[in-house]
UniProtKB/Swiss-Prot annotation:
It comes from the Eukaryota. GO terms for molecular function: endonuclease activity; metal ion binding. The active site is at R153, E161, R201. Residues 278-298 have a biased composition (Basic and acidic residues). Its main location: mitochondrion. The keyword Mitochondrion applies. It comes from Leptosphaeria maculans (strain JN3 / isolate v23.1.3 / race Av1-4-5-6-7-8) (Blackleg fungus). The chain crosses the membrane at residues 39-56. This is Probable endonuclease LCL3. GO terms for cellular component: membrane; mitochondrion. Keywords: Calcium, Endonuclease, Hydrolase, Membrane, Metal-binding, Mitochondrion, Nuclease, Transmembrane, Transmembrane helix.
């Protein structure tokens, strides 16, 4: 004969057994997770994933434009890339290739640097398709090219000005442009970032490799007499090479290199004087003053 309360006692025993089984299962899972054979690989995977993401963001993520450069990169970081075009004797377009050949640039099919305008434009069709549909007349191929390249202004130097905006070309402006184009166009260079200027260009010191030696593009231009030291009252950037730049300019003047050469007989007969050539800064100041006088006269 069963006792009246025997069913209640059995139910308590079953509940207690269930709780005990659950506790054993939880302890078993905890023990398994805390075992070295499980814990060590889990921690290693987590740490490697976090470090990999940080490494990618810091060194292997492509920076297409100046808007993607973090403020703390200036004066601290360098970027490696390929020159896609040279627009003037002291500035050019750079396609950032983080990691260089070690990261696959130049030999992996999906990591090729476009060298033609059409190929550069195609890279931006996807990102700007919506904008093009909204503003079809405002999205030009020039705008698309700017969306995937960095506009670099060589720091510390000022090259002779080409003809533009109705202004005449300075002597040796074409020679300076041809020299720079031959030196760096479609070549890989490294740029040390200094700042962003008012034209959304990156003012940077530019280096290229000649065999195993690193050469400073700005310094070489000064030695060749194809540029002057940058003399604007504001915005000059030299890093730690200002004295080296000024010494190179003085040496070029003494040796009559490039723009510092004395005019030959034909040039003198054509009206060229023997006074010192007009520097790019003097050229800009002269035209700016003339334009102000013209506006004041109106």
């Amino acid at each position: 004969m069963r006792w009246p309360w025997s069913g209640h006692d059995e139910e308590k025993k079953r509940n207690a057994a269930t709780r005990s089984k659950r506790a054993e299962t939880a302890n078993s899972w905890t023990g398994t997770l805390l075992e070295s054979r499980t814990l060590v690989p889990s921690v290693a995977l987590t740490v490697s994933t976090v470090l990999g993401l940080r490494l990618y963001k810091a060194y292997f993520r492509r920076i297409p434009t100046v808007n993607h450069i973090k403020p703390d990169y200036f004066r601290r970081r360098t970027l490696f890339g390929q020159v896609t075009s040279v627009g003037d004797a002291d500035n050019f377009r750079l396609y950032h290739t983080p990691g260089g050949r070690l990261a696959g640039w130049g030999w992996l099919p999906w990591k090729t640097v476009p060298t033609k305008r059409e190929a550069l434009v195609k890279q931006t069709v996807g990102p700007v398709l919506i904008l093009w549909r909204l503003r079809p007349r405002r999205i030009s191929s020039d705008w698309m090219l700017k969306a995937i390249q960095l506009h670099i202004r060589i720091a510390g130097v000022d090259a002779p000005e080409l003809a533009h905006w109705g202004r005449e070309a300075q002597p040796y402006s074409k020679e300076a442009l041809d020299w720079l184009t031959q030196l760096i166009l479609h070549q890989r260079v490294r740029v040390r970032l200094y700042r962003r200027d008012q034209y959304d260009r990156v003012v940077a010191q530019v280096y290229y490799r000649r065999w195993f030696f690193r050469q400073d593009v700005g310094l070489e231009m000064l030695k060749m007499g194809l540029a002057t030291v940058y003399e604007a009252k504001s915005g000059a950037e030299f890093g730690d090479v200002e004295q080296q730049y000024r010494a190179a300019e003085e040496k070029a003047k003494e040796s009559r290199a490039g723009m510092w050469a004395k005019p030959n007989l034909l040039q003198r007969l054509g009206g060229a004087g023997t006074k010192a050539p007009e520097s790019p800064r003097e050229y800009k100041s002269r035209h700016t003053a003339a334009e102000k006088q013209k506006k004041a006269a109106w």
